[in-house]
Swiss-Prot record:
GO terms for biological process: DNA-templated transcription. The keyword Transferase applies. It comes from Variola virus (isolate Human/India/Ind3/1967) (VARV). It comes from the Viruses. Part of the DNA-dependent RNA polymerase which catalyzes the transcription of viral DNA into RNA using the four ribonucleoside triphosphates as substrates. Responsible for the transcription of early, intermediate and late genes. DNA-dependent RNA polymerase associates with the early transcription factor (ETF), itself composed of OPG118 and OPG134, thereby allowing the early genes transcription. Late transcription, and probably also intermediate transcription, require newly synthesized RNA polymerase. The DNA-dependent RNA polymerase (vRNAP) consists of eight subunits encoded by early viral genes and termed according to their apparent molecular masses Rpo147, Rpo132, Rpo35, Rpo30, Rpo22, Rpo19, Rpo18, and Rpo7. The same holoenzyme, with the addition of the transcription-specificity factor RAP94, is used for early gene expression. InterPro entries: RNA_pol_7kDa_chordopoxvir (IPR008448). Its EC number is 2.7.7.6. Keywords: DNA-directed RNA polymerase, Early protein, Nucleotidyltransferase, Transcription, Transferase, Virion. It catalyses: RNA(n) + a ribonucleoside 5'-triphosphate = RNA(n+1) + diphosphate. GO terms for molecular function: DNA binding; DNA-directed RNA polymerase activity. This is DNA-directed RNA polymerase 7 kDa subunit. Induction: Expressed in the early phase of the viral replicative cycle.
Length: 63
């Protein structure tokens, strides 16, 4: 599971491509072959976050 990612320029959902990168561990070069918009390619290339443990809910610290 990955967090939903939408390109801020064109509005396209690029979560599936991010799933391939993080979960399936495909190379960025292989994933970018199927992405046609330059803005989406740039977002995938520059804003990759490491895989998170999604079973733990974050706690709010209000001080």
């Amino acid at each position: 599971m990955v967090f939903q990612v939408v390109c801020s320029t064109c509005g396209k959902d690029i979560s599936h491509e991010r799933y391939k990168l993080i979960i399936r561990k495909k190379s960025l070069k292989d994933v970018l072959v199927s992405v046609k918009n330059k803005c989406c390619r740039l977002k995938l290339s520059t804003q990759i976050e490491p895989q998170r443990n999604l079973t733990v809910q974050p706690l709010l610290d209000i001080n």
